[in-house]
């Protein structure tokens, strides 16, 4: 691992810590969960997971996740992705402004 990689990991850890300590992680996470619920995404992913488990005759978490995750991610609406990304960007801008 290069010094630049280590520095990037340290910066990421600091940002994550600040995100949690400031309460922004919980706010953003709750907002995302509510949006996904309102849009029916959670029900869609549950159905997709159930179908995958039945079709593949497996309950192995890693295998099911590998099959379901790409489609589940693609099912998130552009509006939800944009809204959450804007909240994350605003959080990062606040961090940069305070340093």
UniProtKB/Swiss-Prot annotation:
Superkingdom of the organism of origin: Eukaryota
Localization per Swiss-Prot or TrEMBL: Nucleus, Nucleoplasm; Cytoplasm, P-body
Primary site of residence: nucleus
Entry keywords, A to Z: Activator, Chromatin regulator, Cytoplasm, mRNA transport, Nucleus, Protein transport, Transcription, Transcription regulation, Translocation, Transport
GO molecular function per UniProt: chromatin binding; enzyme activator activity; transcription coactivator activity
GO terms under biological process: chromatin organization; nuclear mRNA surveillance; poly(A)+ mRNA export from nucleus; positive regulation of transcription by RNA polymerase II; post-transcriptional tethering of RNA polymerase II gene DNA at nuclear periphery; protein transport; regulation of protein localization; regulation of transcription by RNA polymerase II
One of the Pfam families matching this protein, by short name: EnY2
Entry keyword annotation includes Methyltransferase: no
UniProt xrefs under InterPro entries: TF_ENY2 (IPR018783), TF_EnY2_sf (IPR038212)
Gene3D superfamilies registered for this protein in UniProt: 1.10.246.140
Record keyword Coiled coil present: no
UniProt signal peptide: none
Gene Ontology terms: cellular component: DUBm complex; nuclear pore; nucleoplasm; P-body; SAGA complex; SLIK (SAGA-like) complex; transcription export complex 2
Protein family membership: Belongs to the ENY2 family.
Assembly notes: Component of the nuclear pore complex (NPC)-associated TREX-2 complex (transcription and export complex 2), composed of at least SUS1, SAC3, THP1, SEM1, and CDC31. TREX-2 contains 2 SUS1 chains. The TREX-2 complex interacts with the nucleoporin NUP1. Component of the 1.8 MDa SAGA transcription coactivator-HAT complex. SAGA is built of 5 distinct domains with specialized functions. Within the SAGA complex, SUS1, SGF11, SGF73 and UBP8 form an additional subcomplex of SAGA called the DUB module (deubiquitination module). Interacts directly with THP1, SAC3, SGF11, and with the RNA polymerase II.
Function: Involved in mRNA export coupled transcription activation by association with both the TREX-2 and the SAGA complexes. At the promoters, SAGA is required for recruitment of the basal transcription machinery. It influences RNA polymerase II transcriptional activity through different activities such as TBP interaction and promoter selectivity, interaction with transcription activators, and chromatin modification through histone acetylation and deubiquitination.
Protein name: Transcription and mRNA export factor SUS1
Organism of origin: Eremothecium gossypii (strain ATCC 10895 / CBS 109.51 / FGSC 9923 / NRRL Y-1056) (Yeast)
């Amino acid at each position: 691992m290069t010094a630049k990689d280590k520095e990037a990991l340290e910066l990421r850890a600091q940002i994550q810590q600040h995100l949690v300590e400031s309460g922004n992680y919980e706010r953003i996470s709750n907002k995302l969960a509510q949006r996904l619920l309102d849009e029916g995404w959670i029900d869609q992913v549950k159905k997709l997971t159930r179908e995958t488990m039945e079709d593949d005759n497996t309950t192995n978490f890693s295998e099911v996740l590998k099959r379901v995750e790409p489609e589940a991610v693609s099912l998130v609406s552009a509006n939800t992705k944009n809204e959450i990304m804007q909240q994350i960007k605003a959080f990062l801008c606040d961090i940069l402004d305070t340093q």
